[in-house]
Amino acid sequence: MKVTVLLSLGRHPKSGRPMLAPNDARALAIAKKLTDKPRLLHVGEASQQSVLRQYLGLGFEQLDLIESPHGQDICGALIADLKGNPCDLILAGQNATGQDDTGLVPYIVAQGLGLQLVDRALSISDGNVTQFLPKGQRRVLTMPSQCVVTVSDKAPLELEYVARRARQGRIEILKPESSPTAALYQGWQLEPKQPGRKRLSIQSNASGWDRFSKRMNTTGGGGEVLKGGVDDSADKILSVLREKKLLSDAS
């Protein structure tokens, strides 16, 4: 099986320095189980080679770098290269970390190649993809003969980094097969992310239905047992109704 892994660069949440994207490292772990030598592919600037070597340190010999200036659309370069170098499976992380991590690149690539896409994969074995679903559920899908798969951030990080491998690995710089085009976000105005509202924490471990039922249940108490004759009971009831202003004094 020929496997190509699309690699991006993340950004450290504290220092802001470029780093490997953890979700792409998860994709490499899955690719390593499917084939001994998957193809590693990145589109970006050649000046980021030192950061890209972090991927080679996970146990890979070569990484293909399609040189593209900053701010150019990478999808066209990826689609053109993958058309010239077809493979059975294209893997990518669900999204990058701290960069322009919209997660749309795999979808655009799949559309450009006319392939199906399976998202949020946890593992791949025997032609089946285990997909992560909300609330911790899982779903097993039969994988098409050719497709694009995005790897969930819930997939395990199983590869270990070795500095010697990072130094010995080779980065092959390729020229883009298509002319670069301006990215869609070139005219956008970037602003710092605003902190969202803090979510309320649920203090009880009971389910929503249990909490709702508890609110709806009315407790007894405060009632009065009427004793005596019918006339006395009727007078007492009328008195209570007047106190509650449910009955006018004239009546």
Listing of model-derived features with the role each one plays in the protein:
Residues H42-E45, G223-E224:
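Metallocofactor- and cofactor-centric catalytic cores in central/energy metabolism, strongly enriched
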